[in-house]
């Protein structure tokens, strides 16, 4: 690049965030080698992609944590975190058994390999579900007991803590993305104004995902407190 002016401005960005003006500092005389628009856009796109993937994963983790906490109604997701020692290897219960809900207050675990019944029973007993399995030699039945008022309040606190952990994870994603933008600024690929604008756009996206966590939390809390 050669120019008489101190700065060269180029337009970049067509992704999720708004189109921005990139300001590249340049000496008044001589030639300055700088990144192309395509290279800058590629780096920004990678940051956006990473942010999106990590935020979606955070929401999935929050949902999985909530699903593992039982309410008074039967739900196969309650068994998501149970690992069974299957031929010496910790294995997800759902991968070795069919789980169904005969009614609103019970679960039926039907192993594909009947020899794993005792191991499945042991895994359920050792879990924090607080449910005693009934092994009839063919399937395992789980009767979901009603939650006491104190237990509902206790579980509500656990869910609230998990929701807050999800929000912290989202804020950490924002922090990491801003560090990446700051790095591009130091490399003269983005101006200070670019970084401010991108950070502002990013905050709006994070705020939307925090609202998702709040919505999921309120729904789970409602389930827990419903008698």
Curated annotation (Swiss-Prot):
Question: Would I find Manganese among this entry's keywords?
Answer: no
Where found, per UniProt? Plastid, Chloroplast
Organism's domain of life?
Eukaryota
GO cellular component terms attached to this protein's record: chloroplast
Q: Does the keyword Transmembrane apply?
A: no
Listed A to Z, the keywords are: Chloroplast, Coiled coil, Plastid, Protein biosynthesis, Transit peptide
Which segments of the protein form a coiled coil according to its record?
Answer: 167-212
Gene3D superfamilies, per the entry = 3.30.1360.40, Ribosome-recycling factor (1.10.132.20)
Report the GO molecular function annotations.
Answer: ribosomal large subunit binding
Q: Which GO terms describe its biological process?
A: plastid translation
In terms of InterPro entries, this protein maps to: Ribosome_recyc_fac, Ribosome_recyc_fac_dom, RRF_sf
Range annotated as the organelle transit peptide? 1-34
Q: Which NCBIfam families match?
A: frr (TIGR00496)
Family per similarity comment: Belongs to the RRF family.
Could you tell me what this protein does?
Responsible for the release of ribosomes from messenger RNA at the termination of chloroplastic protein biosynthesis.
PANTHER family noted in UniProt:
MITOCHONDRIAL RIBOSOME RECYCLING FACTOR PSEUDO 1, RIBOSOME RECYCLING FACTOR
Protein name in the entry? Ribosome-recycling factor, chloroplastic
Organism of this sequence: Daucus carota (Wild carrot)
